[in-house]
Amino acid sequence: MTETNFDFLAQGDPAIAAIIGRELQRQQEHLELIASENFASPAVMAAQGSVLTNKYAEGLPSKRYYGGCEFVDQAEELAIERAKELFGAAHANVQPHSGAQANFAVFLTLLQPGDTFLGMDLSHGGHLTHGSPVNVSGKWFNAGHYGVNRETERLDYDAIRELALQHRPKLIICGYSAYPRTIDFAKFREIADEVGAYLLADMAHIAGLVAAGLHPSPIPHCDVVTTTTHKTLRGPRGGLILTRDAELGKKLDKSVFPGTQGGPLEHVIAAKAVAFGEALRPEFKTYSAQVIANAQALARQLQARGLKIVSDGTDNHLLLVDLRSIGMTGKVADLLVSDVNITANKNTVPFDPESPFVTSGIRLGTAAMTTRGFKEAEFAIVADIIADRLLNPEDSSMEDSCRRRVLELCQRFPLYPHLSPATPVAV
């Protein structure tokens, strides 16, 4: 949002303007370590806040149910072509409102109610839409689950194969929300072929790394690939479906509209196009490589301070801290770091004895603060701040020191310096 938009908003709705101003200040003065968050560019935000929000456009480009779509058609076509180029896909649907919507459209295309599919257990790093009993994927379908090896805390492909042979699923899902290691999509393809299953990769967390060529691509191996467009892709919040099979792509299109959605959000689709264009530039690969280097630096320094990292490290943008060794829950750790302006999230760890509302771990990600310019040296400092806070939870002077160091880092690497509330905002 530009200053001009702030001015309009301050005049039209001072209450909302004040709330947004406070949120801006929160983002500027906090270390954002939630692995699923990032900071979109001003260009992405400008597209999303444009006049395209006014246009209804049910259908696909050149096949709309409304008139006046010639320019939103151009924007959506550009988003489609950029997505295909970015990921090497034959077909792209840019209309899903979210990753969850994208996944549901795939289920509608490939499965019937009661069919069996196989996905990772949520407590091991899977996602709600991969068969959790509280999600439609777990209510309408027969969901089987695999996990990680207890000793290595990594995927055990032999065990996954055995489960696939046992369940004979119609669909296998790979791609996760809290798995810090490289995924062998080719191995999953072998398993899927052996049992005659479709293979879906949900690469929501690693899409930016895949786009940059820093994680193996699922496109050559999977029947369908879904992703969000924020996270490591650094775009607007939304979803995307990709496939190398153009004919399957036509069926997926029908499952998005009219199957699961009505009108697409053309202002968001334009913002997706901007983000895809940014990701096609050479500097995006440099950024993505720094994201991984920063995550590894963060993990190393946390380990040096005596904290346990699930799977003993990371290959991507996220890591899980297992807090059982220091006798702390994820819920408590989340609150402790929040007190010193660090935003993270409690998270289950493999074979976690605690409930999802308590957990034994916290999940940390480096994508957002890398966008702000952090490198390995800064993330080593971040690791020390986190360790100081978690290892000294009752020390008020240490709490003050941690908060001060966080604010110093934030001031060194400003976020959206061109943005400021139109009117003073009390915090």
Swiss-Prot record:
Catalytic activity field: (6R)-5,10-methylene-5,6,7,8-tetrahydrofolate + glycine + H2O = (6S)-5,6,7,8-tetrahydrofolate + L-serine
Pathway: One-carbon metabolism; tetrahydrofolate interconversion; Amino-acid biosynthesis; glycine biosynthesis; glycine from L-serine: step 1/1
Name of one Pfam family that matches: SHMT
Residues the record lists as N6-(pyridoxal phosphate)lysine modifications: 231
UniProt GO MF annotations: glycine hydroxymethyltransferase activity; pyridoxal phosphate binding
Enzyme Commission code: 2.1.2.1
Gene Ontology process terms (BP): glycine biosynthetic process from serine; tetrahydrofolate interconversion
Gene Ontology cellular-component terms listed: cytosol
InterPro entries: PyrdxlP-dep_Trfase, PyrdxlP-dep_Trfase_major, PyrdxlP-dep_Trfase_small, Ser_HO-MeTrfase, Ser_HO-MeTrfase-like, Ser_HO-MeTrfase_PLP_BS, SHMT-like_dom
Site positions (Plays an important role in substrate specificity): 230
Localization annotation: Cytoplasm
Key words of the record: Amino-acid biosynthesis, Cytoplasm, One-carbon metabolism, Pyridoxal phosphate, Transferase
Residues holding (6S)-5,6,7,8-tetrahydrofolate: 122, 126-128, 355-357
PROSITE patterns, per the entry: SHMT
Chief localisation class: cytoplasm
Names of the cofactor(s): pyridoxal 5'-phosphate
Record's subunit section: Homodimer.
Family: Belongs to the SHMT family.
PANTHER family linked to this entry: SERINE HYDROXYMETHYLTRANSFERASE, SERINE HYDROXYMETHYLTRANSFERASE 1
Job description of the protein: Catalyzes the reversible interconversion of serine and glycine with tetrahydrofolate (THF) serving as the one-carbon carrier. This reaction serves as the major source of one-carbon groups required for the biosynthesis of purines, thymidylate, methionine, and other important biomolecules. Also exhibits THF-independent aldolase activity toward beta-hydroxyamino acids, producing glycine and aldehydes, via a retro-aldol mechanism.
NCBIfam families in the record: PRK00011.1
Name of this protein: Serine hydroxymethyltransferase
Gene: glyA
